[in-house]
Amino acid sequence: MTRTDPPDLLVSTVYQDIKVVDPGLTSKRQPCERSVARPAAPTPFNKRHCRSFDFLEALDEPTMETHPEPPPPEPAPPRARPRDSEPRRRTRSKSAPRASQGLATAPASPPVLQRRGREAQRAVRVEGSPRREPSYPALRALANELHPIKLQPQRGGPGRIAPLCATPGRCAPPEPPSGPVPHVRCRLDIKPDEAVLQHAARSSRSCAPRETTSWARTAPQFHGLTVPGPRHVALSRTPTPSDLYCTDPRTLYCDGPLPGPRDYLEHRSQPFTTPPGPTQFFYTEEPEGYAGSFTTSPGLPFDGYCSRPYLSEEPPRPSPRRGGSYYAGEVRTFPIQEPPSRSYYGETTRAYGMPFVPRYVPEEPRAHPGARTFYTEDFGRYRERDVLARTYPHPRSSPPWADWGPRPYRTLQVMPPPAPGPLLASWHGGTGTSPPRLATDSRHYSRSWDNILAPGPRREDPLGRGRSYENLLGREVRDTRGSSPEGRRPPVVVNLSTSPRRYAALSLSETSLTEKGRAGESLGRNWYVTPEITITDNDLRSVDRPTAKGWELPGGRPRQPVSTVPEGPASSRQRSLEQLDELITDLVIDSRSPAQAPEPAAEGLGRQLRRLLDSRAAGPGGATLLAPSRSPPASAGSTEEPTGSGEAADASPEPSADEDDLMTCSNARCRRTETMFNACLYFKSCHSCYTYYCSRLCRREDWDAHKARCVYGRVGSVCRHVLQFCRDSSPVHRAFSRIARVGFLSRGRGVLFLGFPSPGSADNFLRFGLEGLLLSPTYLSLRELATHAAPLGSYARELAAAGRLYEPAECFLLSVSVAVGPSAAPPGAAARPAPRTPGPTVRKFAKVALAAGSPTRPPPARGGEPDMETLILTPPPGTAGLDEEGEAGRRAREVAFIHIQRELRMRGVFLRHEFPRVYEQLCEFVEANRRFTPTTIYPTDRRTGRPFMCMIMAASEPRALDWVASANLLDDIM
């Protein structure tokens, strides 16, 4: 079986004894300049030449590194694992891909040299740490069983790289740097050309190995919010050889070990910086964020990762020792890897400055926690579960991984956290997701109220323990044009109490999961998704529990008690709710973004949520007015009974009440009392307020007394009377029908709006008709209605849905709006019940049939008998064989039945509902050929509103003249 274990392969003969040339001593050349000393005769080239990107890394040309990056000051030597003491031999796979015929060969020198054995390999090993940890040969065999073809870069993948054999002179002009290109695991099992090995052996004898092993670098202080993902490819297409050879080498410069597949999650918590890249990979809130730039965009070259001197500012230093060496005469590229995506929240933020502006924005004058340690992984858990999940025998921080390749980002010197708690067994072998601790798993997304007061978040687990593909989908490459609504992941369901301020606070808190779009996009690019949090008020509801004490905030300052309200049935609960709202609001205010962060749009969701947080209720019952509708009744006593305080909170039932509470019918003549459980089952409420009755009959009986106090119920009743008056009044009906018909013919489907400034003006319209109108009716098309959707809210959506369904040739939509003015409530009335939908206007709409005829035509004279239309219905022309037996006769009778029904339905008559006896006779005629005498009915034509006489003769012969006159003959037959 072909061996593909990366650490064992990297210590093979391919990577040892190759000459190392200091990149800092070379002069600057153009990216595409070829410095290969070509022989007089072309050297032979084996088509089985290794195309592995890891092998080609050993054939680097130092001239490609135009701006080498000197290493930082070396820290104290850390303890690292030694590599395996027994590297293994590999056999060549017969499935090695051949080099393309159209590409020129990479220059190499003959003669042939045999591969070396294990003795030569042991001579040049890098000195490891005396601290040894056991390797796992049994699990290493799992990696050796992988088929090498499955490790090839697939042609359909987003990160595939073209072959590295470039034709001379084909280099395109240099383009601006486009960010790191993701590394692709490739074939490592192909024996390289013997000519290449010979050349490597000769050139490596004159180079003394460097003993500088710097696997950890001192990380600069930076406070980024997000980091790019592992597959963020800046190129918009598959890289061609020109792209690979002509990219700015500094963007491809690496200085650390490359990660393995399972070690992505090990280092995902480390903050780092990256060269400039496309905007969709950096979601920051600073105004100096990246502008979208790709490889074809003009821009200044990237100057490095950190703000320290470079080649032109300080003398070069020796490069750190790498396990492999480099050729001095090969032109190729560097395989690059990026660390996985990791969003974490630092104390402060810093912008990723654009290449052509100052790199870092001035920070706030407050002190930053410079010595704060970010744990990249729970090392205690990692050691305990290392045996369960290790496929590659060494982590990335060990020398074998340092030999394999450099890191493209800065790393941190981290210390393991002390005393890890007991662990639960993991159901999968991954090391990136932490198992919950026993009795100590207090997460920041907990449902507990105590954990909200003292969250104690553990930031190493941004993703829950879910299926592996769900975690991978969260770090995939985002679309350049932004995620479409269909392609986005569905938001997390939020279970909250009825306080809108509480929801706004949790949505803006730092524990909320935010996905921010690129700067300058539309308003829909920002998602505020709150984790699944449930805050119940049952624990705070009890009167005997202390609720007025100050809560201890995480900052250490106690919460001042809120102003007291008059003692009443709900005063203790009201204080508890206000304390909860203000406490969560203060927690959120402390974690808001700094002042330099760009504000959202004028009507963005974030601005609305913050406005809701900053607003305070006008009175003690203001919080209840913001609460949504509550369907179940939940407070003792009747809401119709006037209370001394007159608060709206007392008038609305409470959904969190106990089942032992009682509910009383609001009808004064009934006063039936039921338990809360039974009341929630069958009690009925007023349509406009929270007044409950034991049945619909009691609600109807109490309406005359209830509407005197229910303002919104009374105004809603006025709207219904106006709609009915527009149907019944002939002049109003004809006038509105003409306006609606003309509006439809000129502007398409729409709604006819009729507004009244007060309920009194609506009463004048009911008394005087068109003469009592203060505002003329207005026709708005559906397109114009969409522009006014914001103030109308859900009512606009209902109107739009009805406007798409109504039939303009038969009816029109009429919307009646009545403003609830100060004169709506009668003076001296009792306490008003809390409305369900408080607002300045009550709106209702209905479909109204179009009036028949012209409004200017005088009505027909009542003196004589009006002429009545007569309709005779027989089988359609061409129908024969009604008396035949079997399927043929049944089919003919069925066609006759369909024809009769169709003619009547065109006039708005439905036999099955209006004349069921005639319908049954026709069904028996079709099924059993049972004849019946001609039947006469007198239905009403819905198109004209006039009755007509209809004679149904189902078994008679078809009329001969209808054969010519029928315009829908084919439809009648079919």
Swiss-Prot record:
Renumbered residue ranges of the record's region Disordered: 23-137, 201-233, 306-326, 539-576, 618-661
Keywords: Cell junction, Cell membrane, Cell projection, Membrane, Methylation, Phosphoprotein
Extent of Basic and acidic residues compositional bias: 116-134
Residues recorded with modification Asymmetric dimethylarginine: R749
Subcellular location: Apical cell membrane; Cell projection, Cilium; Cell junction, Adherens junction
Matches recorded under InterPro entries: Apical_junction (IPR038825)
Record carries keyword Membrane: yes
Cellular component aspect of the GO annotation: adherens junction; apical plasma membrane; cilium
Positions bearing Omega-N-methylarginine: R322, R749
Pro residues biased stretches: 69-79
Identification of the protein by name: Apical junction component 1 homolog
Organism: Mus musculus
